[in-house]
Amino acid sequence: KYFYNDVFYKKIKKKKKKDKNLKKIFKKIKMYQKMIKFVYQNQPDGTGDAVLKCKKYLKDKHFLMLLADDLIVKKNCSKEMISLHKRTKGSVIATKKVERKTVSRWGILGFKNKTKNSFSINEVIEKPKPNEAPSNYAIIGRYILPKKILSVLKNQKRGKGGEIHITDAIKTLIK
C-alpha cells in the first residue's frame, strides 16, 4: 500500500500520459493483470517481508520477482532472465554497472566466472560503503529465486534499517 501513496508513483502516473514507454508498460501490466499478483506492504519493511507476503502464490520451485519501483524499459529483461534460468537451473539476478561512489544506494554483488552476459555470484552486500563493495554491479529489482528462500527469510534477523532484506537471504543461500 505504501507504494501507492508514494510521491514517485504519483509522478509516474502523471508522466504516463506524456511518456510513450510508460504508456507501453502500463498497457502490458493491464494486459497481464490476471497473471500478475500485486502484494502490498502497509509500511516499508524490506523486500524479504514482501516476498513472505507472497508465499501463498508461489507454486513452482523458482519464482520471478519484479520490484515495482524499479522500472526497466529494456526490452525482454525478464524473458532473458527466464532463458538463462532454463539453461542453468539456478537463480538469476538482474544487474547494472553503477559508479563506485553510488554503491551505498544498492545491493551490490561480488562474483566469479564472468562471461559476456552472466557471472556466478559469491557475495551480496546491502548498501555497502564504496570501500567495502566487492564490485560496482548493482541489483536492479528483477530476480528469479528458489522457493526455499522463504524458509531462510522466515528465520532471518532484521538487517540495515530494521528491515528484512532479500539480499541477506540470498547471502545465506550462497554459503
PLM region spans:
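Glycine-rich loop at the start of a catalytic domain that most often binds anionic cofactors/ligands
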Residues: 1-7
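Generic, ordered loop/turn and secondary-structure boundary motif
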Residues: 4, 48, 72-73, 107-112, ...
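Conserved beta-loop-beta/alpha segment of the NTase-like Rossmann-fold superfamily
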Residues: 9-14, 22-111, 154
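A short, aromatic/hydrophobic, helix- or strand-capping loop or linear motif
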Residues: 12-16, 163-166
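Catalytic-core segments of class I nucleotidyltransferases/pyrophosphorylases
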Residues: 64, 78, 82-83, 115-175
